[in-house]
Amino acid sequence: MLLTIDVGNTHTVLGLFDGEDIVEHWRISTDARRTADELAVLLQGLMGMHPLLGEELGDGIDGIAICSTVPSVLHELREVTRRYYGDVPAVLVEPGIKTGVPILMDNPKEVGADRIINAVAAVELYGGPAIVVDFGTATTFDAVSARGEYAGGVIAPGIEISVEALGVRGAQLRKIELARPRAVIGKNTVEAMQAGIVYGFAGQVDGVVTRMARELADDPDDVTVIATGGLAPMVLGEASVIDEHEPWLTLIGLRLVYERNISRT
């Protein structure tokens, strides 16, 4: 089986593939302070929950693919693969890795690995032109051209960042539960804040995607818009421009990149 690990700033998502199928997945908090040994213990606990894997770390795993937006965690995971997984082939997404997606940026090395991986999956699953909206710590909008190139994107504050900012900077406001409000017009402070977050972000998505699509394609209707990320369900159904929801887009992209590189490792 292939173990895929997507390390984000707030959460880390792990997926276990049997061929092209995700047979298990986990979401844990990202902690840049964890050592390789601590990560190995954590992985062993998670892997031990699956009936097709053995009790020893690495049993049943025949490949590993990792991308990370946190350099220190990537370093420790590299140590995990070296010390605990032995000869299991591992692909870590870094500059120079073969993705099959040309990056049309002033400095390609600046683009987050997860954003490129999302583009890889978008091209494979839907073709171009496409826009990937990833609802994570930041909300990112990534454009894929009709030729399958990474054409650039937009970075905006994420939903959780906005909620925290309201609670910290608003003298009479507080941190609230992320939930859908009963209506757009809130009848109390919590509902008003929830409405601002949910419908505000839905409006942001519609506005940004509409403008990007006009630049990306001669006919904006040709652009497929894919939503992913842990907080995507908060906005689905309210943002009118979203065509597809693929919660495992990054993990699928990691599988594809692994398959394109393993013969070279």
Swiss-Prot record:
Residue intervals passing through the bilayer: none
Biological processes per GO annotation: coenzyme A biosynthetic process
The UniProt record lists the keyword Nucleus: no
Cofactors required: NH4(+); K(+)
Keyword NAD: no
Binding site for K(+): 134
Binding-site list for substrate: 112-115, 189
Taxonomy, superkingdom: Bacteria
GO cellular component, one term: cytoplasm
Subcellular location: Cytoplasm
Example of a GO MF term: pantothenate kinase activity
First-listed, main subcellular location of the protein, grouped into a coarse class: cytoplasm
Enzymatic class: transferase
InterPro entries: ATPase_NBD, Type_III_PanK
Catalytic residue positions: 114 (proton acceptor)
Cofactor note: A monovalent cation. Ammonium or potassium.
Subunit structure of this chain's protein: Homodimer.
Family: Belongs to the type III pantothenate kinase family.
Protein name (database record): Type III pantothenate kinase
